[in-house]
Amino acid sequence: MQIFVKTLTGKTITLEVESSDTIDNVKAKIQDKEGIPPDQQRLIFAGKQLEDGRTLADYNIQKESTLHLVLRLRGGTMIKVKTLTGKEIEIDIEPTDTIDRIKERVEEKEGIPPVQQRLIYAGKQLADDKTAKDYNIEGGSVLHLVLALRGGQ
């Protein structure tokens, strides 16, 4: 059967499941589709947080039900991204997050597509495929966001 998982950004993920699947199984399927580790996922249905060992049937989750996915950050690091207008955006990251992932988080909060973002830290423009750790970005670090318009490099 099909169920839907709605994320905080409003994105809806469609999953193929059985009612005998455990919540663990569902989280693994979400990881396959979205790359979010199960230990960072909290699934909510009818206002209740779902426990890993229970099955969809235990919660009376039927075909075309919608679950809500909330992310829990374990040991997350809070950084700030400062825009040219002086606005500061707080973002939770993991040291292993790529710069591209950080740009996606900026997009979630500000609606600016990653392709238009240039992130600067310690005077350097950050490469998308590098991680926060590669640049020694840690809690309290402030990145500067510069906008690149119309495909400029």
Swiss-Prot record:
One of its GO terms (biological process) is protein ubiquitination. InterPro entries: Nedd8-like, Ubiquitin-like_dom, Ubiquitin-like_domsf, Ubiquitin_CS, Ubiquitin_dom, Ubiquitin_ubiquitin-like. GO terms for molecular function: mRNA binding; protein tag activity; ubiquitin protein ligase binding. The keyword Nucleotide-binding does not apply. CDD domains: Ubl_NEDD8 (cd01806), Ubl_ubiquitin (cd01803). Keywords: Cytoplasm, Isopeptide bond, Nucleus, Repeat, Ubl conjugation, Ubl conjugation pathway. There is a cross-link at K48, K63 (Glycyl lysine isopeptide (Lys-Gly) (interchain with G-Cter in ubiquitin)). SMART domains: UBQ (SM00213). Residues 153 form a propeptide. One of its GO terms (cellular component) is cytoplasm. Residues 1-76, 77-152 form the Ubiquitin-like domain. There is a cross-link at G76, G152 (Glycyl lysine isopeptide (Gly-Lys) (interchain with K-? in acceptor proteins)). Signal peptide: none annotated. Ubiquitin exists either covalently attached to another protein, or free (unanchored). When covalently bound, it is conjugated to target proteins via an isopeptide bond either as a monomer (monoubiquitin), a polymer linked via different Lys residues of the ubiquitin (polyubiquitin chains) or a linear polymer linked via the initiator Met of the ubiquitin (linear polyubiquitin chains). Ubiquitin is generally synthesized as a polyubiquitin precursor with tandem head to tail repeats. Often, there is one to three additional amino acids after the last repeat, removed in the mature protein. Alternatively, ubiquitin extension protein is synthesized as a single copy of ubiquitin fused to a ribosomal protein (either L40 or S27A) or to an ubiquitin-related protein (either RUB1 or RUB2). Following translation, extension protein is cleaved from ubiquitin. Belongs to the ubiquitin family. This is Ubiquitin-NEDD8-like protein RUB2. The lineage of its organism: Eukaryota, Viridiplantae, Streptophyta, Embryophyta, Tracheophyta.
